[in-house]
Structure formats: C-alpha cells, structure tokens
Amino acid sequence: MGSLRFTQENQNILFIGTSGVGKTHLATAIGIEGCKQGISTQFIRCSDLINKLQTAQVQGRSEEVLRRYARFQILIIDEIGYLPIESVGAKLFFQLIERRYERKSTIITTNIPPSKWGNTFSDKMLANAILDRLVHHAKVIRITGRSYRMKDHLIEKKDNSGPDLSGFSSQNKERSSETL
C-alpha cells in the first residue's frame, strides 16, 4: 500500500463488506498515506457529499463544488448505500464520477453489493452508469467476516437479557482482503 501505485494509474478501489469489517479503516489508512506522500486527498461520507452537491445546486454553485471534488487525486467516498440517493443527488453524483473517470482515483466503501446499487440510486440506469465508471479501472476488494465493533461483547449471557450476540466471537478468522 505504501507506493499507492493505483493513483498513478488513476485506478479506483471499491471496498465491499458488511458493517464493521474495516472498510472505512482501510480507506482512511490509504488516505493518510496519500497525505503523507503529498497526494491531494479528501474523505467524505456519501450522504454529506450528496447534501453538499444538492445545496450547491440550489445556490447556483454546483459547477464550483463539482470542480472542487473532481480535483483531488484521491477522493474517498464512505458509506454508499446506507441511505437512498434521490434523483437530483444521483445525477450530481454521476457528474462527479464522470469528471473523475480515468483522471483521478476514487475509493468507495459500501455494504451494498454492486448488483443492488439500483436500489440505492433512484434510477437504475444511472446506477449502472456510475458503477460502470467506478469498476472499469478498479480493484474490487470484498471483505468478509464479523464486525470488529462487536468482537469484545460477550457471546453468552446467562440471564438471557440483552441482545443476542451469539453470532459474534472475540476471534475473527473469516477476514479476507486483497493486498493493495
């Protein structure tokens, strides 16, 4: 990961996996390394990005904001799919991805498999166009396993009170990821 060669080739990275498996942690680590190497880097949650793009459009500043996010060599967009993206937001998001396509590197974290992105974006054709541009020059990394956040919780409760955490263990042997 130290070389960040993917940025020289304007490749993208998609981290796909359930909540708590380390997608954001890995994306953040890449972003920090990018900053250390002097690479322009921005991290933003998808919902915040969509809100900023929509607000800018209402204020007549969408071009300015799209240009701003298009210029970063590494743009990390966290948590695509946690909240639905309505038509206006989806169109603005597409414009941003189109501007970055084959010019800059975008890192995406999502808990939604690409086949379900049509449910996240209000327009399935637009979702396909976005996904097509993101995965064309991308390393797609699927991370499996159990949530790091739940690993320290007890798996057995003698009094049967509280949530059932029997599906979680303190050791996670199912993790897998690809070396960048």
Report residues per predicted region:
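Walker B motif beta-strand of ABC-family P-loop ATPases
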Residues: 74
